[in-house]
Amino acid sequence: MIIHQSHPEPLSGNKAYTAVTIAYEPERIPTILTGGCQCGAVRYRADAVLDSSHICHCRMCQKAVGNFFAALIGIPRDAFQWTRGAPTLFKSSDPVTRGFCAKCGTPLLYDYATSKHLNVTTGSLDNPAAFPPRGQFGSEGRMSWFGDLSQIADEGTTEETMAEFAPAIKASNHQHPDHDTDDWRA
């Protein structure tokens, strides 16, 4: 993946993210995938993806997903449909609209207006492990410790690290399952 980033000179010590140009046409991969929000009020389906799974470290993406980076995958517009509900939309810049579930807050969508595709958050996929990142950009916002993640101590599973709370959380789980359902109590 060849990516070109353009940044202006720092203003008041901050670098501003201005443009990202992907210097190739991502390959369209026919596949069926589904996904949606945590509560199940918003669901989607796609009949193809692009080989563009990536993470973006820019500050705007960090704010949009409430995390250190956004994990996204491109989907051709003609292959995508909302199957239950629709996200609430927020215009984060003139060309970009982001979508999230109004009920549970799950970030779902990054939509650049003039693009032939849209991006969904990889974490909202029913099988996110199937689409590991193939690239990253927005490096001006990347956390300085990002490269050290694999060196952080692994404390164990939820059941091991939260043994006192895990059974009650599991027994009262309101999260939508990782597959389509005919209906849901969202």
Predicted regions and their residues:
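A short Gly-Trp-Pro
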Residues: 2-34, 41-186
